[in-house]
Amino acid sequence: MDFNQVKVINHPLIQHKLTIMRKKETSTVKFRTLMHEVSMLLAYEVTRDLEIEYEEIETPLATMQSPVLKGKKLVFVSILRAGNGLLDGMLQLVPTARIGHIGLYRDPKTLEAVEYYFKLPEHTQDRDVIVVDPMLATGNSAIAAVKEVKALHPKSIKFLCLLAAPEGISNFHGEHPDVPIFTAAIDEQLNDHGYIVPGLGDAGDRLYGTKLAH
């Protein structure tokens, strides 16, 4: 597997919070809070290479050339529903970002992604886009979502998740070798139900307090 396009974010705070999220006894409220906190930290890393330019400003003491973000506003694209759990923290860091949603569910028999909703901001072309979903398991949902985003010709695309499985990384980069993956951890494997092991369960169910269904 080629990991040149995979960035594992090993920040101690992220890893500590992720450990608590993994624990089966962690409550929905705590899980949701941690998701918010971790998403802010992940957003800091995934936006590290944004372009800047300089503008002249006046401080109380002098005039100076100071850096600001260059170009159009970012677009965050959430893969529903669990992707929404990452948005609040990211928006706290980048409040001017535009938001898109792609609704996909995983067919329980085939594990293929089925689209039921698609709405992205106007003028997504020429913008930097970050597609978010907590789990990169089989990779099918991420593959489908990024394909839709590519059709709009953005300036760049990144994929951000909490956990990734080796199978998901391989499948994703088999279809989108040009799109970098940012993740907090790469786990061992998928089980027969397509869940990441050891993982943290179903991120959407744990985030919204719904029952895990196999």
From Swiss-Prot:
Kind of enzyme, top EC level? transferase
Which top-level group of life is the source organism from?
Bacteria
| Names of the cofactor(s) | Mg(2+)
MF terms from GO for this chain are: GTP binding; magnesium ion binding; uracil phosphoribosyltransferase activity
Q: What is its EC number?
A: 2.4.2.9
**Which CDD domains has this protein been placed in?**
PRTases_typeI
Q: Which SUPFAM superfamilies match?
A: PRTase-like
Enumerate the residues binding uracil: 196, 201-203
Coiled-coil region(s): none
Alphabetical keyword list: Allosteric enzyme, Glycosyltransferase, GTP-binding, Magnesium, Nucleotide-binding, Transferase
* HAMAP family in UniProt: Upp_B
- Name by which UniProt lists this protein: Uracil phosphoribosyltransferase
User: Which species?
Assistant: Legionella pneumophila (strain Lens)
- The gene from which this protein is expressed is upp
